Amino acid sequence: MMKDSVIRFWLTHHYLHRIAKKYPAFFDQLMYEVCDKKREQLIMTKRYLQREKFEAIALDLNTDVRNIFRIHKQVIEKLIKI
């Protein structure tokens, strides 16, 4: 069960990079529909479209890196549930 969850999480993360690279407009629309808050959408856009590291995103948003990880994980879990 845990192994399946990790694999699903990793595959979603991997394909988000590919989608963001090939179809940036589609990625923006997907994040707009999936993310409840503007902050979640901003984090995902910075991570996948602008290819920023979590530490750089945390500095830009003036928050802790763990908070960025938590929000990122929540959004990916929402995508998995779709």
Q: Which functions belong to the PLM regions below?
A:
Residues 1-33, 55-56, 62, 81:
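N-terminal interaction/assembly modules
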Residues 33-41:
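Short helix-coil-helix linker/hinge
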Residues 41-42, 66:
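Short, solvent-exposed positions on alpha-helices
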Residues 44-45, 76:
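Hydrophobic residues on short alpha-helical segments
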Residues 45-52:
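Short helix-capping/turn signature of helix-turn-helix
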Residues 61-82:
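DNA-recognition helix of helix-turn-helix
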